[in-house]
Amino acid sequence: GLMEVYDESSVRKDYQSRLRNKMALDSKIQGAYIIADNKRTIDCQGIVRDRNVYTDYVGCGQGKLVSESATNWFFFGADESSDKVLDLGIDSYCLRIAKKMNNQPAMMIINISDSFIRSAMQSLDPGKGGYVALITDTDGKEFYSDESVKTEKALIYGTSFYKKALNGKKDSGNQMITF
């Protein structure tokens, strides 16, 4: 009854406060959310959603993939169609980490700031004409350290070089390739 509603509201406020505090202390996180249905989504902004965010997200490609495994963490690049479904005020992120909650119709979603990733990548100076890219294998999205790089399709993902690097036994290495 009324006590359960109060307890749920109290727990939601506690977790929203924790998310806000974490984000205030950690510039790497652009947004953190626990999505669920029945107005139970918890986000860093304290907004109560009047729709079933979890069900809506599971209806798109990203959400469907995450919903199929409670043991895996999934890494995605920025995705406009998923962002529209989530409608969580998502701005400038380049890496989304998503995980289904064990035995619950809920997911944790953390969006990592593009400026944080870009600054880390820029320290890996590839030299004149070179690129540094973060590639999310789950969806093939490429994020470049150089903001001016805009591509219609992937330059690296799916190429023979990419497959060789992904399946290689070495922990590190480099190779010059030309496009």
Question: Can you say where each PLM-predicted feature lies in the sequence?
Answer:
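Extracellular/periplasmic juxtamembrane segments that couple receptor/chemosensory ectodomains to their
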Residues: 106, 126, 138, 148-179
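Non-catalytic interaction/Regulatory regions outside core domains
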Residues: 6-12, 97-99
